């Protein structure tokens, strides 16, 4: 992929209102369950990013007819489990860790062989955390010697339900086991050490599949059916996080974000920002298809450093690049622990964010499972590298609001995986962003 670099002008404020793209986690799951359902599923508000498009491409390769996307609308003509067909090629999910881990569980119970692969970044990420519990259910999946993709899934093995306790809180692993559990004999129960996003459980019930929860354990019984339905995807709070931080740190900002996913397993970023002193107001709430949504108003505020409670870490795991920028602009010191998972995301987010913040003149002390950041009133400018991580690129774009010189960001092309139109939205809300690369083809 041709590289794309950004140059973001220093200073400014954000005004107006916006609806960020649809939630990536919910978009993936809606396509997957729609394909496995009996009947037709109509999805609106879907994220048209590269990751979700990769999931759509996988199911087309498995014989599912899917219309769209067109302006966030997709129609999935479900074929049931029995209607899936052997693909004629490897199933390439690009940069999408969600696709790979959830599909590993979904494909494990099929009667034919499949191969899951991704781009160079994804094929370096750890996959044993999902293949090992699937093997306990009877799945036969081979990885590289390092435990990474490609995943070769040998079909035809009968699966049996298990009781499994996650060693590390992971919604992706939980979801993979529940998807495999639908094809398994008996009950599959997954116990979490800490709460994680529960979109899979909510959506299974929305498609008519019974799921039970008792405290930290979620269970389902194999052999039930899914039924096509309508899914209205809320705006992605992980994408909204960049704008919540941006409006918080830029003096004079006043921004309203519409129809943001307000699932309580995803609102850790708002809780952390509020503890730092952010002015975030819930204007209204609603529930759409079993998922809570909210309109949020955020105004600039003087942030202060805090020790981030470890119990909030799994509820904000994807939002820490944005939160690191908030910490860099806060008065005092912010401490993060219990977040070793950040080292095995699309990049080593602890190391890469620390490197970039140090380039901007911030005092940062990276640790094995977290970081110490000393905030300052004004950031320096400079050139940082995103390491092709979409959330790193967007975080440093936001940092320019408190910089004294332009911030240049290398390798921003993967922002299209989660937030197509990010640059255009920043410009509309009042920021100055220049792009060098393929952005003019409408892919950023």
UniProtKB/Swiss-Prot annotation:
Pathway, per record: Metabolic intermediate biosynthesis; chorismate biosynthesis; chorismate from D-erythrose 4-phosphate and phosphoenolpyruvate: step 6/7
Compartments in which it is found: Cytoplasm
Main localisation: cytoplasm
EC class: transferase
Listed InterPro entries: Enolpyruvate_Tfrase_dom, Enolpyruvate_Tfrase_sf, EPSP_synthase, EPSP_synthase_CS, RNA3'P_cycl/enolpyr_Trfase_a/b
Gene3D superfamilies in the record: Enolpyruvate transferase domain
Residue sites binding 3-phosphoshikimate per the record: 24-25, 29, 170, 172, 318, 345
Complex and partners: Monomer.
Known function: Catalyzes the transfer of the enolpyruvyl moiety of phosphoenolpyruvate (PEP) to the 5-hydroxyl of shikimate-3-phosphate (S3P) to produce enolpyruvyl shikimate-3-phosphate and inorganic phosphate.
Family, per entry: Belongs to the EPSP synthase family.
Protein name stated in the entry: 3-phosphoshikimate 1-carboxyvinyltransferase
Lineage, highest ranks first: Bacteria, Pseudomonadati, Pseudomonadota, Gammaproteobacteria, Chromatiales
């Amino acid at each position: 992929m041709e590289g794309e670099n950004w140059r973001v002008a220093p200073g400014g404020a954000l005004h107006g209102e916006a609806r960020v793209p649809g939630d990536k986690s919910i978009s993936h799951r809606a396509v997957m369950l729609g394909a496995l359902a009996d009947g037709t599923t109509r999805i609106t508000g879907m994220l048209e990013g590269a990751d979700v498009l990769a999931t759509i491409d996988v199911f087309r390769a498995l014989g599912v007819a899917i219309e769209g996307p067109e302006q966030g609308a997709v129609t999935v003509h479900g074929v049931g489990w029995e209607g899936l067909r052997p693909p004629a090629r490897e199933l390439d999910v690009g940069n999408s860790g969600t696709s790979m881990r959830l599909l590993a569980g979904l494909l494990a119970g099929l009667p034919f062989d499949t191969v899951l692969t991704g781009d160079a970044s994804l094929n370096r990420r750890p996959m044993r955390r999902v293949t090992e519990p699937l093997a306990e259910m009877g799945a036969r999946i081979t990885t590289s010697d390092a435990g990474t993709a490609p995943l070769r899934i040998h079909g035809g093995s009968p699966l049996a339900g298990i009781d499994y306790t996650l060693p590390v809180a992971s919604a992706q692993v939980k979801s993979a086991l529940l998807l495999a559990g639908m094809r398994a004999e008996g009950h599959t129960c997954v116990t979490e050490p800490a709460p994680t996003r529960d979109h899979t459980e909510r959506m299974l019930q929305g498609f008519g599949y019974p799921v039970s929860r008792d405290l930290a354990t979620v269970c389902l019984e194999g052999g039930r059916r899914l039924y096509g339905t309508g899914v209205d995807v809320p705006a992605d709070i992980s994408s909204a996080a960049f704008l919540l931080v941006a409006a918080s740190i830029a003096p004079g900002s006043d921004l309203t974000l519409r129809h943001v996913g307000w699932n309580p397993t995803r609102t850790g970023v708002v809780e952390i920002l509020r503890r730092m002193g952010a002015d975030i107001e819930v204007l209204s709430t609603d529930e759409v298809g079993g998922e809570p949504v909210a309109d949020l108003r955020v105004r600039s505020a003087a942030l202060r450093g805090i020790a981030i409670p470890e119990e909030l870490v799994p509820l904000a795991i994807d939002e820490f690049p944005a939160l690191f920028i908030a910490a860099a602009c806060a008065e005092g010191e912010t401490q993060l622990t219990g977040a070793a998972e950040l080292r095995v995301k699309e990049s080593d987010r602890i190391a890469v964010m620390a490197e970039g913040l140090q380039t901007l003149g911030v005092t940062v002390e990276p640790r094995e499972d977290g970081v110490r950041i000393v905030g300052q009133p004004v950031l320096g400018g400079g050139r940082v590298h995103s390491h092709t991580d979409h959330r790193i690129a967007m975080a440093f774009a936001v940092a320019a609001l408190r910089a004294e010189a332009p911030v240049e960001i290398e390798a921003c092309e993967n922002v299209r995986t989660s937030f197509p139109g990010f640059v255009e939205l920043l410009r509309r809300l009042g920021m100055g962003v220049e792009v060098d690369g393929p952005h003019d083809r409408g892919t950023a």
